[in-house]
């Protein structure tokens, strides 16, 4: 599996995972913290791991995104290809609440509790790391 970038259609940000556990979006394609590895747990279920830090994208019980040192149930996301060819990533452990990974127009992460289907903030395009 080649590493990928997660490009958000809302403002053109790449999802970034910092070593300190913070998650946000950046428009800098050369940022080392935006390279992500996807691991399929089962069909449509993925772990998203930072290549640089080795941490996993996770969503806590308040809907906040953070980076986890090890893969837990909070790190499992339901990956779905939508009609517009963008993907959405819904927290599996909070699936009954419909909480999605999202980035706001200012590049900050959107709490899962504030996301809902149809928002641009939750639409992501997995892109290859190299632009060539």
From Swiss-Prot:
GO molecular-function terms, A-Z: fibroblast growth factor receptor binding; growth factor activity; heparin binding; integrin binding; S100 protein binding
CDD domains listed in its UniProt record: beta-trefoil_FGF1
Job of this protein: Plays an important role in the regulation of cell survival, cell division, angiogenesis, cell differentiation and cell migration. Functions as a potent mitogen in vitro. Acts as a ligand for FGFR1 and integrins. Binds to FGFR1 in the presence of heparin leading to FGFR1 dimerization and activation via sequential autophosphorylation on tyrosine residues which act as docking sites for interacting proteins, leading to the activation of several signaling cascades. Binds to integrins.
Subcellular location: Secreted; Cytoplasm; Cytoplasm, Cell cortex; Cytoplasm, Cytosol
Similarity-based family: Belongs to the heparin-binding growth factors family.
Name of the gene this protein is made from: fgf1
Keyword Protein biosynthesis attributed: no
Protein name: Fibroblast growth factor 1
Cellular component, GO, one term: extracellular region
Residues holding heparin: 10, 108-120
Example GO BP: positive regulation of angiogenesis
PANTHER family: FIBROBLAST GROWTH FACTOR (PTHR11486)
Organism: Notophthalmus viridescens
InterPro entries for the chain: Fibroblast_GF_fam, IL1/FGF
Pfam family, any one: FGF
UniProtKB keywords: Angiogenesis, Cytoplasm, Developmental protein, Differentiation, Growth factor, Heparin-binding, Mitogen, Nucleus, Secreted
């Amino acid at each position: 599996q080649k590493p990928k970038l997660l490009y958000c259609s809302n403002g053109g940000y790449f999802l970034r995972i910092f070593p300190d556990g913070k998650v946000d979006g950046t428009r800098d394609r050369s940022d080392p913290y935006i390279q992500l590895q996807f691991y399929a747990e089962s069909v449509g279920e993925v772990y998203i791991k930072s290549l640089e830090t080795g941490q996993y994208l996770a969503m806590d019980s308040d809907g906040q995104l953070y980076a986890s040192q090890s893969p837990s149930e909070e790190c499992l996301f339901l990956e779905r290809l939508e009609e517009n060819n963008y993907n959405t990533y819904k927290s599996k452990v909070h699936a009954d609440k419909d909480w999605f990974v999202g980035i706001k127009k200012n590049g900050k992460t959107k709490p899962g509790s504030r996301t809902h289907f149809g928002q641009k903030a939750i639409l992501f395009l997995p892109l290859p790391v190299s632009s060539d």
